[in-house]
Amino acid sequence: MTVSLSESERLDERIREVVSRDLCSGCGACTLLDSGLDMRENEAGYLRPVRSTRGMVDTRAEVTFRKICPGVTVSSNRAYGSKRHPVMGSYREMWVSWALDSEMRHRGSSGGVLTALSAWLLESGRAARVVGAQAAPDPRRSIPVTITTRAEALAAAGSRYTPVATLSAPDVLLANSAVVAKPCEASALSSLVAPLKEQGIDPLILSFFCAGTPSAIATDRLLLTLGVESTTPLEELWYRGHGWPGRFTARDGATTVSVGYDESWGSALGPTTQWRCKVCPDGVGESADIVAADYWQVDGRGYPIFSEGDGTSALIARTKRGAEVIREAARAGIIHIEIARMDSLAAVQPLQRDRRSFLAARILGSILAGRPTPVFRGFGLIRLSLRHPLRAMSVSRGTYSRIRRARNASV
């Protein structure tokens, strides 16, 4: 006898496949297809979709899910009129930039440009709301937030190096919204709204360079090494900002503890990024209208220098709309912009440059070790890896060996 599954049951099956293969990025896009899904932190400290009830479900939820889920597929976006850089993606223009408001520049992760643009979009009426992320009531964790004022934009400034599912906020699909989201979220949202633009659902998407989502447990462990117990109530916790690159800082009222970015990200948080992020083809936000990144100063070897200073961003317009917004904001005195070459950004972003350059090799090693990856289209990954075949072979072998060792250790 053939059993007919409901749409929500079919969606659940597809979600289980992605989660069981460790390919979920925790973006929350699936919750927009079915109101009975919630994003919850699992035992490893990552956000995953969980069925809480049978809610309102899109009539083509399962089909749509297979088109938008970053754990299933990601495609390179090439907007009309854009140029193409092999590792930084498609773009129309690129600038060195920072917020002209000194408080926003100081509070933001690099130059404060996304915070400044968010506030200006609201104050100028170009957006009715900006959906992003901010600290939860317990600032050890992060939550989606709908921002409607300059003060709220400033309160949400700075990176949050802990899981948050920005797309679990339904406001992302309201007309006249802007959304500040991770690259995987930008990809899912761009794919989701593509057929909805005639209905007026076409959010301005702002993103940022992303090296991956660390486990929330890494934050707890880092705090413990700094003497902050899990039971200690925190008033504030910021990962970056308040300078550039800014220090990981926690405050419980009477006491403040902090550690530098190189140690917080490099030693404690970064090593815990989830598997899906390790095979990400798009840490540079190709599906967004506007993307910000750190425009690092580098040493003689080309590695970023993390000494404190005034924040400086690279600001990329990937679409005509994004370029228009950036130029209007500059004319309005919101941000400073100086035209720059994309090669100069690639030179100071070694992680993004190397990850994309050898991702095909990493994927090959992963598949040979029996670990599947999503389908990636349009990034030219094979061609990039073939430019340096010996190093690509080394990356493949290393990936294969690490996966096999991890599997044997867990048996």
Regions found by a protein language model. Give the residues of each.
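Short, charged low-complexity linear segments at domain edges
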Residues: M1-E13, A29-T53, A156-R160, G243-D262
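Local cysteine-cluster metal-coordination motifs and their immediate loop/turn environment
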Residues: R21-G36, T64-V74, K182-A188, T272-G285
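Extended interfacial segments that mediate partner engagement and assembly in macromolecular machines
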Residues: M88-G108, G112-T115
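Portal/gating segments that form or line small-molecule/metal binding sites
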Residues: G108, V113-L173
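Long, compositionally biased charged/polar accessory segments in the mid-to-C-terminal portions
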Residues: A127-A128, T231-V411
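Intrinsically disordered, low-complexity linker/loop segments enriched in Gly/Pro
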Residues: T148-P203, F209-S215
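Short, flexible loop segments at boundaries between secondary-structure elements
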Residues: I201-L224, G322, A347
